[in-house]
Amino acid sequence: MFIGHFGVAFAAKKVAPETSLGTLILAAQFLDFLWPFFLLLGIEHVRIAPGITRVSPLDFTDYPISHSLLMAIVWALVLGAMYYALRRNMRSAWVVGAAVLSHWVLDFIVHRPDLQLYPGGSARVGLGLWNSWMATIAAEVFCFGAGLWIYLSCTRARDNAGRYGFWALAAFLFFGWLSTLFAGAPPGVTALAWGGMAMWLVAPWGWWADSHRAIAHST
């Protein structure tokens, strides 16, 4: 899943209004933010195999540190604890941790059985939604659209940066996702990894746009 993860970050603002959207994006995408580092270091591996699923051409050979269930729980606890140590807000810390773990849950839905339960384990799981174009698109659009609606219902723009900066972010994510659907397989693993590294820039973009928005209070 891709934009569905960002939908989780948008929606989380409703239950953690004090938390920056940038932090929520970092949490919801943290496993994918780690993954390209491990690819470049040769610790985790992926194979480009067009046709392995109808949607994604990637054969995730092994990625136990970034994407096994056990490590997803560990990363969730680490980020939640770090947030609490910095902000002393227990509820928001739990939301940050839950956003991290939500990434594995959504990946479990779309991936073929390639997600390990723990590093070194032989069992691999995944429901394989990527084997259906229509189901994948429906799930992505629903998660992203619902998250976007929730975020817009609980925040309001304070200025043009908060209005257009946020919509530019949403458009970048949506059309970037569409481009990956129709662009075909990436030219190589290194290019794929550097493209993943570039996605780190989305977190500060989210922080900046969110800093120009205010919590919308019902009257």
Model-derived regions: residue spans:
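N-terminal membrane-targeting hydrophobic helices
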Residues: 1-219
